[in-house]
């Protein structure tokens, strides 16, 4: 609710607000129903809007949320999954790795995943 959120912002004097807009932490089971109208209303206010639970959202959804006023996006689950997926791949490969090369492989996989997002968040890329 816009009025309730703004009352909270004003009373708490927070620096940024992460409203309940239909996103969720973790992995989505189905397509989330995003309250774009609330993001748009809050995006016109001076307090920056934070999008929590960004992992799994489409590039189109990110673009729309940012255009409407989203100023910070959290994608922690996505980063953690890149880490876990590469770790699992390397362990199951049966190949023997020394710790440093193993860590480097995992780190590079995470970097590659993370690199995709600034382009989407800035509007230079329309898909992952």
Where are these regions (language model features)?
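Hydrophobic faces of well-ordered beta-strands that scaffold small-molecule active sites
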Residues: 17-19, 49-53, 71-75
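Extended, intrinsically disordered, low-complexity segments
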Residues: 89-128
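Glycine- and other small-residue-rich loops at beta-strand/loop junctions that grip anionic moieties
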Residues: 28-31, 51-54, 76, 106
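Flexible, active-site-adjacent loop/turn segments at secondary-structure boundaries
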Residues: 19, 26, 55, 77, ...
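A hydrophobic, small-residue-rich beta->alpha segment in the mid-to-C-terminal subdomain
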Residues: 66-96
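Alpha/beta enzyme core
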Residues: 1-45, 59, 63-68, 81, ...
């Amino acid at each position: 609710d816009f009025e309730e959120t703004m009352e909270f912002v004003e009373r708490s004097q927070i620096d940024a607000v992460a409203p309940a807009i239909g996103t969720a932490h973790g992995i989505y089971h189905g397509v989330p129903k995003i309250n774009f109208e609330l993001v748009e209303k809050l995006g016109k206010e001076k307090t920056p809007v934070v999008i929590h639970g960004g992992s799994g959202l489409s590039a189109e959804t990110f673009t729309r949320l940012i255009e409407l006023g989203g100023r910070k996006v959290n994608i922690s689950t996505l980063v953690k999954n890149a880490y876990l997926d590469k770790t699992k791949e390397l362990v199951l490969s049966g190949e023997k790795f020394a710790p440093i090369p193993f860590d480097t492989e995992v780190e590079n996989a995470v970097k590659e995943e993370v690199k995709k997002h600034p382009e989407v968040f800035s509007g230079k890329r329309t898909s992952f």
